[in-house]
A protein has these predicted regions:
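One-carbon transfer enzymes
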Residues: 2-199
Length: 199
């Protein structure tokens, strides 16, 4: 919704900390997503495509993939896109779809862990360290090969909202642009579940 990870990517491209990269299109399933506004402000094409507008999930999946193919993208970046990615898209874009998750996978991830629920889970368990993970997307939920992780300390008195903000500022907004830059410059290879990063 808010598009803060998108803004971090836009800033990274403008400041040249992300190189060899341009944003072809921003797609949201939520017509009210501020990410669409952010994209338009920077002259980036913004598209809303929602499963609710289709008679079946299969029809949505087919159109979504067709529209994505039309942009001829090399990399698909998910940031708060809560629609299940069609399996045919995962197969076609194998190790070319990345997602950011606001915990250190394999903790507090998988079905049901999204948004504030992740940080509520971390605080309820009493962990001292949490963070964020950028990973390739596979057929599972948060199960794909891990590209980058960054740890963030949990502090006394944290609320889910405070912790969410700290994880965004200290981890998400740093490692998502970093991962894109590494991939765009051919420094990332995947063997099975393991990502190798060349210097």
């Amino acid at each position: 919704g808010g598009g803060t990870n998108l803004q971090a990517i836009i800033d990274g491209i403008e400041q040249k900390t992300i190189t060899n990269t341009e944003i072809a299109v921003v797609i949201s399933n939520n017509p009210g997503a501020y990410a669409l506004e952010r994209a338009k402000k920077h002259g980036i094409e913004a598209v809303c495509i929602s499963p609710k507008e289709y008679e079946s999930r299969a029809a949505f999946n087919e159109d979504f993939l067709r529209r994505l193919d039309a942009y001829e993208v090399d990399l698909v970046v998910l940031a708060g896109f809560l629609v299940v990615i069609p399996e045919q898209m995962i197969a076609k874009y194998r190790n070319r779809i990345i997602n950011i998750h606001p915990s250190l996978i394999p903790s507090f991830c998988g079905t049901g862990y999204y948004g504030l629920k992740v940080h509520e889970g971390a605080l309820a368990r009493g962990v001292k360290v949490t963070g964020a993970t950028v990973h390739f997307v596979d057929e599972g939920t948060d199960t794909g090969p891990i590209i980058l992780q960054k740890a963030v300390e949990v502090q006394e008195g944290d609320t889910p909202e405070i912790l969410q903000r700290r994880v965004m500022e200290q981890a998400e907004w740093k490692i998502m642009p970093q991962a894109i830059d590494l991939i765009a410059n051919g420094k990332v290879t995947v063997t099975g579940k393991t990502v190798h990063i060349s210097k």
